[in-house]
Amino acid sequence: EKVREYLDVLDRQSSRLKKLIQDLLEASKASTGSINVELEELDAAVMLSQVAGEYKEKFEKNNLDLIIKNDVTPVMIQADGRHLWRVFDNLMNNINKYAQPGTRVYIDIIPKDSGAIITFKNVSATPLNISSDELKERFVRGDSSRNTEGSGLGLSIAESLMKLMNGTMELTVDGDLFKVTLEF
């Protein structure tokens, strides 16, 4: 029985370590620009909907109500599909881990002439006594109590990938309101 517990702990910890190493490699490659980027015309609304579908059960488990506002479809942008998926996934994962349970999560998709502005907004479960710039640094986490798993690389990776796709990522913290704006 004890041996089984130890093996389970070892398995979980080795999986965490593997994920950390993968994130470190991706963060390094993304920040130095040594990642292959293949820009193509994509429907951001469709991809966001697919990523949101992957988080549906997790959000329900945390009693998070996802509201996606998109008045126009399709919303065509120039992006690399793999990297855009990772950006959306990182942001949704952050929301799932750090949002106040029982609150609403808003995602607004606003088409513009040659791209789109996509805004993610949620209320943090804990006060964010940290600047927006600090949150985007590697290994920095808004949850200083370390109650959740994570490497503190997600936002840094997302920002680097956005730059590689000729986009921008702006992060705003206002009290416990967390807002990320992606612009393509």
How should each PLM-predicted stretch be described?
Residues 32-37, 76-79:
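Conserved micro-motifs of the catalytic ATP-binding
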Residues 38-56:
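A conserved beta-strand-to-alpha-helix junction within the catalytic ATP-binding
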Residues 95-96:
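Short helix-loop "hinge" at the ATP-lid/N-box region of the Bergerat-fold HATPase_c
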Residues 38-42, 60, 65-75:
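Conserved catalytic submotifs in the C-terminal HATPase_c
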Residues 127-140:
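Short conserved segment of the HATPase_c
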Residues 12-17:
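Short alpha-helical segment of the dimerization/phosphotransfer core of two-component systems
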